[in-house]
């Protein structure tokens, strides 16, 4: 039994701390749990890793994080050793349990390999990490986060020097380097104190935060909105990283807002929600309650790493309405098309193949092109780089995917809920000032361009059994579905 060999190896490895070995010893006799923790190595995919926290090869822990980091370090050094050591890497983390520990372990491994590691003093959003890569001019970046996944999860995403998540050719090459590491003893690691003493672990100061927020603020379209001070907004970061920066942005622009006090402080236990996911209506419960109490017309919610945003708005019957990710994307696009000055003639909107086809009629109505990528915002970030390098003809205007991810501006190369929240607040206040609303503007879109309906169903399959079920489902799909699905031809 291969999983039992791995279990025994971890029990006896000098690289594993005694307290973690105690956890492993407590599993003795529980073969099912041992198998689930060790039956495979947690997969380092093309963007990073994500999984349930715990000790084992199929869990997120500091040893798995170290292995991933050693693989990335090996790739950086093989790609260009001089450049890797000169430019280094930037590291951020969210509010989740273990995130700070994993971020420091990442820095310690990089430092042990002679690569400078710039690290934020405490939690920061994913889009600020994306911004930080180009701001500091590093070769790569890492953010420790599991985004909007359940509380027991954590993870780790890798970015390249353009500030976007890694894509080809880097992604598969990094995966290959990680997979070459067979033992924990191959991983280089030094103490945090030694890394700081050698100048290889460097703490970032607050200037990067200020400059990131300044970059966001350049994306505002209307600062002088009549009656803005009377338009009430409720905001919640759902216990995540968005609270501090979003309060600052809304305050600086003079919005009348209140935060959900029970959810404003970072807390990796997410005590007030089942899932800290703005795609879930239940996540808005406290926000909507506060909005009803103070007479607010919109609630904005970010996920824990502040790269996604969901909203609740009042409809024509004064009931709460929850626009989905596609609807918010289309509303933002229409607002930009109608209010942004000097849109280039080669402007492009970028979205994914699973997002709404309604974009194909809205964007061309203003002579703006549409480009579609595979699922994942990393491909949208890749297109920005290709525009800048003149590999493709186009100027980036806006990017979005149906899963509540949007990017306005090119300060970051990943979805950014902070800049999006700022523009949504502006959009909502502006529509209110002209006697309209977000809901009413959505209905206008449908009347002008036609009605579209999309939906998502999420299915959770856990553990080894879940992985096997998923594999069987996909195998059946590939084997039995060839040219047609549900009466539709597959292109």
Range-by-range predicted roles:
Residues 38-58, 146-147, 237-245, 304, ...:
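Conserved phosphate/anionic-ligand binding catalytic regions in large, soluble enzymes, centered on
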């Amino acid at each position: 039994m291969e999983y039992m060999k791995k279990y025994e190896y971890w029990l006896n490895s000098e690289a594993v701390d005694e307290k973690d070995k105690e956890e492993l010893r407590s599993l003795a006799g529980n073969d099912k749990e041992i198998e689930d923790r060790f039956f495979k190595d947690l997969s380092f995919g093309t963007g990073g890793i994500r999984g349930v926290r715990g000790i084992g090869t199929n869990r997120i822990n500091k040893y798995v994080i170290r292995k991933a980091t050693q693989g990335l370090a090996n790739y950086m050094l093989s790609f260009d050793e001089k450049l890797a050591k000169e430019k280094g890497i930037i590291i951020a983390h969210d509010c989740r349990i273990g995130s700070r520990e994993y971020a420091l372990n990442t820095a310690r491994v990089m430092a042990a390999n002679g690569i400078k590691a710039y690290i934020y003093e405490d939690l920061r959003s994913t889009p600020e990490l994306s911004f930080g890569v180009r701001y500091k001019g590093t070769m790569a970046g890492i953010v420790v986060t599991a985004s909007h996944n359940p509380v027991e999860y954590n993870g780790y995403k890798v970015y390249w020097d353009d500030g976007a998540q890694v894509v080809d050719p880097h992604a598969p090459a990094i995966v290959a380097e990680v997979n070459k590491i067979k033992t924990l003893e191959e991983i280089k690691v030094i103490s945090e104190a030694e890394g700081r003493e050698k100048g290889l672990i460097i703490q970032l100061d607050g200037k990067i935060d200020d400059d990131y927020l300044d970059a966001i603020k350049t994306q505002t379209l209307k600062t002088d909105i009549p009656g803005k001070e009377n338009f009430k907004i409720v905001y919640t970061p759902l216990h995540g990283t968005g609270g501090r920066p979003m309060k600052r942005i809304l305050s600086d622009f003079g919005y009348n807002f209140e935060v959900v006090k029970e959810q404003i402080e970072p807390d990796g236990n997410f005590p007030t929600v089942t899932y800290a996911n703005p795609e879930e209506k239940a996540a808005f419960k406290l926000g909507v309650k506060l909005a009803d109490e103070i007479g607010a017309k919109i609630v904005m919610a970010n996920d824990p790493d502040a790269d996604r945003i969901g909203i609740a708005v009042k409809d024509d019957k004064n009931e709460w309405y929850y626009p989905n990710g596609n609807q918010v994307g289309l509303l933002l696009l229409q607002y930009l098309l109608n209010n942004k000055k000097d849109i280039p003639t080669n402007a492009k909107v970028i979205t994914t193949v699973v997002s709404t086809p309604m974009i194909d009629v809205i964007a061309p109505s203003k002579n703006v092109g549409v480009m579609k990528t595979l699922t994942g915002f990393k491909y949208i970030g890749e297109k920005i780089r290709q525009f800048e390098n003149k590999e493709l003809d186009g100027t980036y205007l806006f990017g979005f995917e149906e899963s509540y991810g949007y990017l306005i501006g090119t300060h970051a190369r990943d979805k950014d809920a902070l800049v999006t929240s700022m523009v949504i607040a502006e959009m909502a206040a502006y529509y209110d000032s002209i006697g309209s609303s977000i809901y009413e503007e959505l209905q206008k879109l449908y009347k002008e361009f036609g009605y579209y309906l999309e939906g998502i169903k999420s299915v959770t399959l856990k553990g080894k059994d879940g992985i096997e079920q998923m594999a069987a489902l996909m195998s059946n799909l590939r084997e039995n579905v060839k040219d047609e699905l549900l009466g539709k031809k597959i292109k």
